[in-house]
Amino acid sequence: MFKKKPTASEVDGVQYRRAKTWQIICYACNALVGMSVYSLIGMASYSASIGYGITTAAVGIILTCTRILDGITDPLLAFVYDRVNTKFGKLRVLLIAGYLIEALALYGMFTGFSSKGMGLVTFTLLYVVYVIGYTTTNMTAQTIPAIMTNDPRQRPTLGVWTTAFNYLVPMVMSMVLNVVLLPKCGGTYNQAFLTSACNITLIVAAIGTLLVCLGVSSYDKPETFVGTKKAEPLKMADIVEVLKHNKPLQCYIASNASDKLAQQVGSQAIINTILGGIIIGNIALGTILTVISMVPSIFFAAFGAKYVGKHGSKKGIVNFTCISMVITAVMVVFFIVIDPKQIGVMGSPAMIIYVLLSLLQNGSNMCITTSNTSYMADAIDFELDRSGRYIPAVVSGTYSLVDKLITSFAAVIATGAVALLGYTATMPQPTDPCTPAIFWMAMVLKFGLPIIGWIITLIAMRSCPLSKEEMVNVQKRIAEKKAAAQSEFFKEQLQ
């Protein structure tokens, strides 16, 4: 007879809560909202240029300023989050409200007012409204993993599902938009393409919102949001206090914000157009190759989750970051020594090597993402242990504030870089010729910036105290404090 493997609760001596698999999958469908909108908003620079006549430089400034606004609204939402308690719950109300706000703004930005003679003011106002809706949806979703489970083995599993969806959704959207829709609209970014892309995105996001609401329904009740101390109204000083004293959160901000800045610069539509359309010379095939290399790499996330469940979130972030740095450096050398146009030739050795390198790169990046998902939930529990208050929106909002202030420069870096290449009044198109300046700019933005971000990650994580062993102690202390608080509550009731 085989012995039953002991659970994490039995091993650690802590009664962990666990979510059902279908609930985790429904939560992961939040990617249908976030990543489909992410794919669409990545084309905001094209909408601004085509639909509103805004210059490249002005677009970069607008997107940077609105991104900073996005960061400021994140901690402010914590106050709303703290006060929303309806008979329909907290999470579901905020998720649906956020979707409706951003859907109206995106429809106006890409369809309703686009190419109707409107200008900079209209575009900017619509973008601001979008930011408010996006913040409401995204910030609420970020608090859910810590609410669903605190089992150290299951948290990385939740990360696997979210990672898989976060990569699959933009891949599918990219295929639909660039391989199916773009050729039907003449092969260039125009108003017809932007309108159709917006309509598809809003339908996908609506489905995702409903599925997430279904997944969190059993957790969306008042007792879920109770801490280990008497609840007090949230104040702005609480946000400052969290940022000042939550060391794991400080480390996470430094590591993840730098990584995300590089990721967002490289994922801008204009950078992908340069790499796939101008350097490789076949944007449709380039998109297909990206999907081919991405799908198998999702299985790496399962390996990453198992590793993180065994060794902890911090160790997962550090080790997989080192692997990603090596693979990305090899990718740069590969582009330098070959003729990149050969990648665009179906079945060529260059194409096969590119797919394999992309597979390894995407796989290691997925393992980092899985580790990060688990780490953020750990940071929320660390704060509960440290301060006695269960304030997931404050922790995630504080992170998002600093994160978005840093990553707000992604759009201006990308648009500023292509402006240096001569694209001051227009945007790069797949049919443009490749020059040495374009090639090296793409290498720096697509591969160089991520390497710099990972170096910052390794430096930040050296001072992080949140090891696997420490997280077990954190959960034990939380359980003891909650039991003591409950006992004190019953004593007060009897008096």
What label would you give each PLM region?
Residues 2-495:
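Membrane-embedded alpha-helical bundles of multi-pass transporters/translocases
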